[in-house]
């Protein structure tokens, strides 16, 4: 079973931020730096939002962007992609080493690209994410989900890391097929709203409850909190879900590390 650690050591998932929705991000009530995954010497950064480079520098021990092997964007929205260019600079050691891979949906590098032309030339390659495809990053693989229901082209991720499966749901409106794809040992869910918000393509706490109940992972981690979730105290809500579902549910905090 996964365990929470205070600092990275060996193989881990580290939350460089847990902000969801624009006002939590803008006011930095929670950090918005994305998620760093490390396994067997391979390092991947998912969704480097605003302040990702700062959160790497502030981590203890410090996370070195020059050790990254890949950066993945689940979609182009600012809370997920704002720091993509500076993190590409970091991964390539200021552009002096052509290394690393960037994975992103096609609309992230369209005419209104979130990746600057200069930065796009720095990594070894940019791979376009498509629905239900498998990708390899050195020592582990990941799959993309079906396209999510969200204004931007958005895909979630399922990682096979050693003997552990980790699913990361990205922003989406709830739909039934989510539970069939995201079955995993560790399930990470973005819970923007405390209560349903019709017409807005994000998950609420009831959606998270339904998904966790259907998948029954060994551990579920709530993150990407909006204002209503913060006011409702995510750790209290996670404790309630643990009691209700009989599954370990944790509310992520900025800097939290989960070891394998």
Model-derived features with residue positions:
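Short beta->alpha connector loops
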Residues: 50-51, 108, 148-151, 170-175
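Cap/insert and terminal regions of metallo-dependent hydrolase folds
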Residues: 174-259
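Metal-dependent catalytic neighborhoods of phosphoester/phosphodiester hydrolases
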Residues: 82-91, 114-115, 230-239
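Active-site neighborhood of phospho(di)ester-bond hydrolases with catalytic His/Asp-centered motifs
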Residues: 45-49, 68-79, 104-105, 166-172, ...
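Metallo-beta-lactamase
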Residues: 2-6, 97-154, 161-162, 255
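Active-site metal-binding motif and surrounding structural segment of the metallo-beta-lactamase
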Residues: 51-101, 184-186
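Conserved beta-strand hairpin/beta-sheet module of binuclear metal-dependent hydrolase folds
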Residues: 2-60, 153-170, 186
